[in-house]
Amino acid sequence: MTQSVVVQVGQCGNQIGCCFWDLALREHAAVNQKGIYDEAISSFFRNVDTRVVGDGGSISKGKICSLKARAVLIDMEEGVVNEILQGPLRDVFDTKQLITDISGSGNNWAVGHKVFGSLYQDQILEKFRKSAEHCDCLQCFFIIHSMGGGTGSGLGTFLLKVLEDEFPEVYRFVTSIYPSGEDDVITSPYNSILAMKELNEHADCVLPIDNQSLFDIISKIDLMVNSGKLGTTVKPKSLVTSSSGALKKQHKKPFDAMNNIVANLLLNLTSSARFEGSLNMDLNEISMNLVPFPQLHYLVSSLTPLYTLTDVNIPPRRLDQMFSDAFSKDHQLLRADPKHSLYLACALMVRGNVQISDLRRNIERLKPSLQFVSWNQEGWKTSLCSVPPVGHSHSLLALANNTCVKPTFMELKERFMRLYKKKAHLHHYLQVEGMEESCFTEAVSSLSALIQEYDQLDATKNMPVQDLPRLSIAM
């Protein structure tokens, strides 16, 4: 079995990462009750004999001694990482695989990318190499970061190029949290656009998630729970927003619940790599099947169910509803409407007590309501993992390469241009060594080119197959 390394960058990246490890440990504990270190758990955890001085002797089989997450934690402030190291998961992280500073990036992409990137490049590379040495077959780096701040956007995208240069054959999956229009970081449009250029050039797959969608989801769940519409039938710990408290404090802040939704997404995304299944999907198959053109590697994700009812018998109707929900606006982790946009490809990653026949039936049922590009009408990729998430009998993660992502990028560009036309706050960036105004113009040109690619695809929508323009090949 292959291994993956999680790289969590900045405050947001580390908080989501911590939630992910908490949930992953609970999942493996529920399945692996004998405490045996097996291939499933080795995909994201090392088994270390803490009695061995130095790096700790890795144990490839037998009883679990001390689990260490295959993770690198990076932040240019100490607060969140220190909180993790004082929390219930403190022993899960290798303290040699942490990089922190005390000054922070000041919500400035240039500081994170240019200053801290140069300053910490060698240390970061050393941590990556060390993580790779502990893997028998390293398949993927998962990067978790936010786009609005300085460290996540700047340093988070700097290390993508480092990974591409050092490990060109290893996939780079990026989970990027996009700021909402009401973001309290006034320079977040600059940071996001500058980061987008790096994502366009150096990521294999990007899962864009916006804060507003996460907030809308938890608001809907809270409304249903508090209004009594769900009665007392919600299964304990089945809410996609719930956590056992990997981080201290902040119990009732919406960001905790929002982070848990993203952690659940990552949990389901990696389930085929961590558990057996009748139709497992390798992580490299996601990029292979869902990304037909290099730059169009942005995948819109949706998660269902958001909670599970306590009755054990699942009527087929409810199972079918799970598939329908995955294509509805309410379950998207990005403000998007995939059903009314154009699909390039779609992956359905199902977990739990679901049959292949259920999967096929629902694809056939939903197909007429979805529009795929003419050259990929059967652009479905499916997986079935037999192990459901804790608290659920079944779940579904849908990943769509769909033109519905375009409005998010257009809105981001508009917010960027509102600032840039006034040259507002530009001096904070230009005073950083290595930062020039051309960095901004190149970044917005890169985004404009990406939007144009989606425009060209949208132009083929509803066009008869025989009228579609043919690919011209230069001779």
UniProtKB/Swiss-Prot annotation:
Record: residues binding GTP: 148-154
Write down the superkingdom of origin: Eukaryota
Q: Kindly list the GO CC terms recorded for this protein.
A: cytoplasm; microtubule; pericentriolar material
Q: Which UniProt keywords apply?
A: Cytoplasm, Cytoskeleton, GTP-binding, Microtubule, Nucleotide-binding
Where the protein is mainly located, per its record?
Answer: cytoplasm
| Database matches in InterPro entries | Epsilon_tubulin (IPR004057), Tub_FtsZ_C (IPR008280), Tubulin (IPR000217), Tubulin/FtsZ_2-layer-sand-dom (IPR018316), Tubulin/FtsZ_GTPase_sf (IPR036525), Tubulin_C (IPR023123), Tubulin_CS (IPR017975), Tubulin_FtsZ_GTPase (IPR003008)
A GO molecular function annotation here is: structural constituent of cytoskeleton
Subcellular localization, as worded in the UniProt entry: Cytoplasm, Cytoskeleton, Microtubule organizing center, Centrosome
**Biological processes per GO annotation:** centrosome cycle; microtubule cytoskeleton organization; mitotic cell cycle
Which family is this sequence assigned to? Belongs to the tubulin family.
Subunit and interaction comment:
Found in a complex with TEDC1, TEDC2, TUBE1 and TUBD1.
Q: What is this protein called?
A: Tubulin epsilon chain
Natural source organism: Homo sapiens (Human)
What lineage does the source organism belong to? Eukaryota, Metazoa, Chordata, Craniata, Vertebrata
